[in-house]
């Protein structure tokens, strides 16, 4: 989990006075892990410039988050107990997410301390390519797919006068960039085994130090 790294990054920015803000993304399942609670407590205590964004997609791998969590909002309800002022937002509403994120980042940058945003959304596919997702009701999947934020926001933009051809071109460029990155990764050399133990320490080494 990146919680500790996020707090470390935020502390570094606070110490150096750079005005930088760390943004840490997590899933709903991570809210049941001890490191999540430790990170929120430390961030609030030290008033770190960090924004935690929980993508609550309703499932903790293969388990509905509601069946293993005692509170209805697994991230926001916990964050409040650590002194944060959490925000719950429709994670499929592009502009709503943008607005709450901008506000949280602005507060953190201006000394307002950490923030947590719980974005309610849905995982369209399984947890991995090996997961067909049969444990989810078909009606539930169809309901959420109908709220897919990409076509929904495309409709918003075209309704405001954006040329559909421009949106097609943007989508094509994004797909091309992903395809290019995939091919470059496949064509690249395999990492050398000895690199697995480098950069353990800040100086790039890995030898044990007494």
Residue spans of the language-model regions?
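Glycine-rich ThDP/TPP pyrophosphate-binding loop and its adjacent helix/strand module
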Residues: 3-187
């Amino acid at each position: 989990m990146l919680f500790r790294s996020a707090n470390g990054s935020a502390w570094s920015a606070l110490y150096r006075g750079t005005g930088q803000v760390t943004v840490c993304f997590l899933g709903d399942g991570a809210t049941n892990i001890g490191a999540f609670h430790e990170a929120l407590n430390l961030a609030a205590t030290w008033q770190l410039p960090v924004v935690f964004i929980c993508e609550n997609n309703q499932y903790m791998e293969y388990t509905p988050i509601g069946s293993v969590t005692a509170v209805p909002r697994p991230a926001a309800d916990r964050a409040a107990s650590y002194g944060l002022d959490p925000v719950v937002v429709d994670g499929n509403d592009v502009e709503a997410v943008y607005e709450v994120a901008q506000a949280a980042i602005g507060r953190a940058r201006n000394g307002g301390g950490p923030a947590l945003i719980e974005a309610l959304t849905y995982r369209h596919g399984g947890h991995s390519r090996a997961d067909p997702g049969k444990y989810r009701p078909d009606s539930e999947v169809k309901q959420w797919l109908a709220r897919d934020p990409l076509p929904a926001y495309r409709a918003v933009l075209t309704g405001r006068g954006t040329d559909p051809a421009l949106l097609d071109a943007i989508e094509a460029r994004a797909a091309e960039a992903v395809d290019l990155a995939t091919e470059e990764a496949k064509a690249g050399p395999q990492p050398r085994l000895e690199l697995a133990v480098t950069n353990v320490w800040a100086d790039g080494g890995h030898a044990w130090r007494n």
